[in-house]
Amino acid sequence: NINEAIKELLNGSSKKINTQIVITTHSAHILNSKIHTSNSFNNISYISTPNNEANVVNLHDEIIITSEEDKTKKLNDLKFIKKHIKFKVSDMFFADAIIFVEGVTEETLLSFYIDNHETLGLNKYYIAIFNINGAHGLVYHDLIKLLKIPTIVITDLDIKRTDDEKINFTPINSLDARTTTNATIQKYKGGDDISNITDHYEDENLYITYQSEAVEEYYATSLEEAFILQNHDNNILNNAIKEVKPKIYEEIVGNPETRKNLVDNSYKLQNKLSKSKSDFANWLLYYLSIEDDKEKHPKLPNYINSALDWLKTKLALANDGQ
């Protein structure tokens, strides 16, 4: 590891020589090694050139978590980041942009669409996509703002339902008097009331987005439900659902098929898919991959497209030096 290599090098030097060593790297592995062997962000300098200007951030443990006032929680959050960053997340330091998602479906779809849909204008950039569920992603927000990397946080509206609504799979057609259980939205809105929620939140280089508008008269509570509402008549979506939940699909759509029934049963369907999200994502990816006509691909929900438009603008401005 890095620390042992430096120690060995210094042991072989003359005792009369004071040595300073600077290591520059584009390797997430080397950065990982530094953080984990020293158990610290100290002595790491992050250098970037946004808008053709040098930006240097001298990292140290005291500035990684700044918004948390509880000392114990702050120490635990820092410990979590040091451990968790080992699992691919160190790539964020070398990315042009970052997208945080909360599920395998979002991760799979965004990776495919960014790479394969040139109209999004993002496939020429290195965009790191991290699947970090729920409130755990919040721990990274202070660090992301320090690094000034354009970042999208895609989260879920997570509408709180009554027991009867859960049992009957009642779709939601109004946000009046509704609340959310989502920790990210609660933080940026300053509470759990979503009756007058805005379509997104921006905080410096962070863009937080969620299912803020009704689709086919219903408010989705997850990406899967939003995707179903947006694309209920799309062949690829229907084929993927049939592969994963054939009996549920036939029960809802009927024979002959009435695909409009997917709209009224969107919450029920996303609930039934909740334990099969990896299968659902993989079948979507399969049918997307074999369909060369991109006009036949399902559409990304509007709240995601709006976030990607924001990101494209941010990256274009940085690339042009503005």
PLM feature spans:
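Conserved Walker B catalytic segment
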Residues: N1-N11
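Glycine-rich, phosphate-binding/catalytic loops in enzymes
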Residues: A5, N39-N42, N116-E118
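Acidic, divalent-metal-binding catalytic cores of TOPRIM
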Residues: K16-N18, L31, S48-Q322
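Conserved D-loop beta-strand region of ABC ATPase nucleotide-binding domains
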Residues: T24
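Catalytic "switch" loops of ABC-type ATPases
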Residues: S27
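Short regulatory helix/loop adjacent to the ATP-binding pocket of P-loop NTPases
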Residues: I30-N42
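Conserved catalytic/dimer-interface elements of ABC ATPase nucleotide-binding domains
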Residues: S45
